[in-house]
């Protein structure tokens, strides 16, 4: 038996023992928010590989952590010990067909995959297609689903607190409403580091296996700076050089895109589609380096990045999402529908109103038919106020710990507002997503 297969079988047995002996989850330390990300090799193995590691660890919930055996061929079980597209179940058994793990691999507290459950939109006879002509079947199916629900349903989402206890964010919803958000948000800034506790791509794969969706972003350091949050607010000495072959800026950008492509390729091999917001919060305040430029310069960067990831690196499981910032969508920073599958916005205003002005402004830029996500928000807009016409967002995605904290002197989302939003008939959770595999 190959060594990788032996390692996986040992890990599976350990998972059974772990779950049998303990009902408590142990917090996972993801390291500090400013931890630098290494632009290492592919996720499948090699130097700098954020997934590689000796001795394979088990997460507190029973799934494989990033420090464990590197998944091969898109399955947790390498070398032929396949899990048939699913994830490890709570008892350590292999779950077929993407079934949920009750207590394992992000399926905490009884999450279910809800194949064919309510909230599904029809994806038959779909007339839309991703901008990537070589898009994977999973990416195509996901985009069709998003279009099918747009205007009638809204996807719930939660960004993980990657620098603390990432599972804690999801657990909070289970404890509060006994449901999981439909979307798990992750960030490739926090994939690697000295205190790595769980890998972004592995967690995304596990959430997909348990029946959920994933949306990823990347707080990329300004080339040639290292990838830290502070460096994502830096500046590029010569922005035009980013897309000019042979320049130091271009070499650095390519290295960062190589790193992201390797992570996305890992998910592609696992047949996981990704909603990707590579350069989010584009706005006139120029919070991040990719906004410290003209609209034409940003569009060149965007198109270069899309072409590099898809054509040069062979990544085809991505739905490309342009993400505007708090002050509204900017038409001169819009790359066009030929280079964007979705166009959305971030916001941090207080209250549970539908933020109709931001929705209308974004719609004026991206067009009347493209689904518009609220892909980062401090507060949850109440679905009862969003529909049918005020602001029928495709999704909301609550940022990090804003679901239950009194950050900046006030509470962002009380348990009462969370319960109201998740109980609304318009809201789709992980439990009510259809089987999109």
Regions found by a protein language model. Give the residues of each.
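Aromatic-lined carbohydrate-recognition surfaces of secreted/lumenal glycan-active proteins
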Residues: 157-159, 277-279, 302-329, 369-380
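Ser/Thr-rich, Pro/Gly/Ala-heavy low-complexity intrinsically disordered linkers and tails
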Residues: 13, 18-124
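Bacterial N-terminal signal peptides that target proteins for export
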Residues: 1-10
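Substrate-binding cleft of extracellular glycoside hydrolase catalytic domains
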Residues: 193-315
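Boundary/entry segment of secreted carbohydrate-active catalytic domains
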Residues: 124-176, 180-189
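Alpha-helical scaffolding within the catalytic cores
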Residues: 141, 164-173, 198-202, 259-263, ...
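Substrate-binding cleft of secreted/luminal carbohydrate-active enzymes
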Residues: 150-161, 370-437
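Aromatic- and acid-rich polysaccharide-binding/catalytic face
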Residues: 330-353, 397-399
């Amino acid at each position: 038996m190959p060594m990788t297969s032996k390692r996986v079988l040992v890990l599976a047995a350990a998972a059974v023992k772990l779950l049998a002996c303990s009902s408590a989850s142990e917090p996972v330390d993801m390291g500090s928010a400013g931890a630098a990300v290494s632009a290492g090799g592919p996720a499948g193995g090699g130097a700098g590989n954020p997934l590689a590691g000796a001795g394979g660890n088990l997460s507190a919930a029973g799934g494989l952590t990033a420090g464990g055996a590197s998944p091969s061929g898109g399955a947790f079980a390498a070398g032929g010990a396949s899990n048939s597209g699913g994830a490890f179940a709570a008892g350590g058994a292999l779950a077929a067909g993407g079934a949920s793990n009750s207590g394992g691999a992000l399926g905490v507290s009884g999450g279910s995959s809800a194949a064919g459950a309510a909230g599904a939109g029809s994806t038959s006879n779909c007339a839309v297609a991703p901008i990537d002509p070589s898009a994977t079947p999973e990416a195509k199916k996901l985009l069709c689903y998003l279009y099918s629900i747009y205007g009638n349903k809204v996807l719930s989402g939660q960004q993980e607190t990657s620098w603390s206890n990432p599972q804690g964010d999801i657990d909070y919803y289970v404890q509060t409403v006994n449901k999981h958000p439909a979307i798990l948000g992750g960030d490739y800034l926090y994939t690697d580091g000295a205190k790595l506790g769980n890998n972004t791509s592995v967690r995304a794969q596990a959430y997909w296996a348990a029946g959920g969706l994933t949306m990823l972003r990347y707080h990329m350091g300004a080339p040639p700076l290292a990838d830290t949050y502070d460096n994502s607010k830096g500046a590029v000495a010569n922005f035009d050089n980013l897309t000019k072959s042979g320049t130091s800026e271009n070499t650095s950008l390519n290295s960062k895109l190589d790193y992201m492509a390797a992570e996305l390729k890992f998910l592609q091999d696992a047949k996981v589609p990704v909603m990707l917001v590579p350069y989010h919060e584009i706005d006139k305040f120029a919070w991040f380096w990719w906004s410290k430029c003209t609209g034409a310069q940003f569009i060149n960067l965007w198109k270069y990045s899309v072409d590099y990831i898809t054509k040069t690196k062979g990544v085809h499981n991505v739905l490309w999402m342009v993400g505007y910032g708090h002050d509204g969508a900017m038409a001169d920073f819009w790359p066009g529908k030929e280079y964007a599958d979705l166009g959305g916005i971030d916001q941090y205003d207080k209250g549970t109103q539908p933020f109709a002005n931001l929705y209308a402004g974004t719609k004026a830029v991206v067009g009347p038919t493209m689904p518009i996500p609220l892909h980062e928000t401090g507060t949850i807009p109440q679905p009862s106020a969003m529909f049918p016409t005020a602001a029928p967002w495709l999704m909301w995605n609550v940022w990090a710990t804003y679901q239950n904290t009194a950050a900046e002197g006030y509470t962002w989302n009380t348990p009462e507002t969370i319960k109201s939003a998740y109980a609304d008939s318009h809201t789709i959770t992980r439990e009510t997503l259809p089987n999109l595999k």
